[in-house]
Regions:
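Conserved Switch II/interswitch segment of TRAFAC-class P-loop GTPases
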Residues: 13, 49, 79, 268-289, ...
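Switch/connector loops and helix/strand junctions flanking conserved nucleotide-binding motifs
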Residues: 14-17, 52, 82-87, 104-107, ...
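Switch II of P-loop NTPase G domains
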Residues: 20-24, 47-63, 227, 246-269, ...
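N-terminal accessory targeting/assembly segments
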Residues: 1-103
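C-terminal-of-GTPase-core extension/linker across diverse P-loop GTPases
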Residues: 2-7, 27, 126, 130-202, ...
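Switch I (effector-binding) loop of TRAFAC-class P-loop GTPase G-domains
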Residues: 186-189, 210-240, 249, 254-262, ...
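Short alpha-helix plus adjacent loop in nuclease-associated cores
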Residues: 102-120
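Conserved catalytic network of the ASCE P-loop NTPase/AAA+ motor domain
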Residues: 66-68, 89, 232-236, 241, ...
Length: 392
């Protein structure tokens, strides 16, 4: 396990609580990538330092810690510019990563199919291109001077050309596979399509396995699923298609959103979305907003959607003593019943609370799915609505 330290900043927009939540998530990402976190550093900043992201005093404090504890990798919670990465690398003299780089590394580890590997490689190349100059710092002393004019720059330009060519080849390869996958989706006929979406590690694959009695890879790690899995599911006598998709995350690199276009096409072309939410997470509402932001970016936010609150078997409200009249009651003190009332008042029958692990309320979910899929199917094929009763 690589010894790592994490670095985050506290700003006016990103207060202490939110910053610590992001860093907890970064620690989970680090563990998923095979690292172990020895310490977390934070600094209050109005604006990141354009040269080193954090201030000089904090830089010196971290540098001493790195030396004393033989730290191999430093990971920043925000994306670093090429200049910042280069400057920090010189000061710390160890591997420097940011959240984007870390996510790309996890995706590279998790990619199993040729298509997923191609998508990840494209995202990595797009991330790498503006950072090539920093990788040639060992040639900086050769720049300029008599007889030493520009060998470093020549190497950089050569590398840039290689990476640009690689990007072009990968894009063409993805286009070809996209066409093929579009044809495959077309060949599935007119069956209603349901896509399971949600934040990473909320239990989408576990739910997919339960509904379809199939074996989609599910694990308590971030991004356990990269490749979209499509299954035919029959509830009552109504057949439809259901797909499990890659999990979303806050600060998801734009390169990945672009690269995983075809994976997201499963969401774009779906008739109904099952938005799975981990109700046990203290910031599940923010996770919901992050997913909806990406759905909006791919023009899928207004699709018919069922909100599926998962992991109710593990939900625990923060308790307050009955005679405590000082502590302010907030959402973290809500009981499960209070959350149910809150969301059902807002969204009515489009909400359900389940436990995929304990199979709790799964029959109710199936009935709700049947009702929604039947509604779409009957609209599409009004002449055969008699085949599918309103209630199963």
């Amino acid at each position: 396990m690589e010894k790592t330290v994490l670095i985050g900043i506290i700003t006016h927009e990103q207060g202490l609580e939110k910053s610590m939540d992001y860093l907890d998530e970064l620690a989970f990402l680090t563990m998923t990538a095979g690292g172990t976190v020895t310490k977390t550093f934070t600094q209050k900043l109005n604006n990141p330092n354009p040269k080193t992201f954090i201030g000089e005093g904090k830089i010196n404090e971290i540098r001493e810690y790195i030396k004393e504890n033989n730290i191999q990798t430093v990971i920043f919670d925000d994306e670093l510019s090429a200049t910042q990465e280069r400057n920090i690398s010189k000061i710390f003299n160890c591997k420097i990563l940011d959240r984007t780089n870390l996510i790309l590394d996890i995706f590279a580890q998790r990619a199993k199919t040729s298509y997923a590997k191609t998508q990840v490689e494209l995202a990595q190349c797009q991330y790498l291109l503006p950072r090539l100059k920093g990788m040639w710092t060992h040639l900086e002393r050769q720049k300029g001077g008599i007889g030493m004019r520009g060998p470093g720059e020549t190497e950089i330009e050569t590398d840039r050309r290689i990476v640009r060519n690689k990007i072009s080849l990968l894009k063409n390869k993805i286009k070809a596979i996209d066409k093929q996958m579009h044809v495959q989706r077309g060949n599935r006929g007119k069956l209603v399509r349901v896509a399971i979406v949600g934040y990473t590690n909320v239990g989408k694959s576990t739910l997919m396995n339960l509904l379809c009695k199939s074996k989609v890879f599910a694990e308590d790690k971030l991004f356990a699923t990269l490749d979209t899995t499509v299954r035919k599911l029959v509830i009552g006598n109504l057949p439809f298609l259901i797909s499990d998709t890659v999990g979303f995350i806050r600060k998801l690199p734009t390169q990945l959103v672009e690269s995983f276009k075809s994976t997201l096409d499963e969401v774009r072309e779906a008739d109904l979305l099952l938005h799975v939410i981990d109700i046990t997470h203290s910031n599940f509402e923010e996770h919901k907003q992050s997913v909806e932001k990406i759905l909006s970016e791919i023009k899928s936010l207004n699709k018919p959607t069922l909100l599926v609150f998962n992991k109710i078997d593990n939900y625990q409200a923060v308790e307050i003593e009955a005679d405590d009249l000082i502590t302010e009651r907030t959402k973290k003190h809500y009981t499960l019943d209070q959350w149910k009332k809150t969301w059902m008042n807002e969204l009515g029958e489009n909400v359900i609370f389940i436990s995929a692990k304990d199979k709790k309320n799964i029959d109710d979910l199936k009935e709700l799915m049947y009702s929604k899929v039947r509604e779409i199917h009957v609209t599409r094929f009004p002449y055969n609505n008699f085949l599918y009763p309103e209630i199963i």
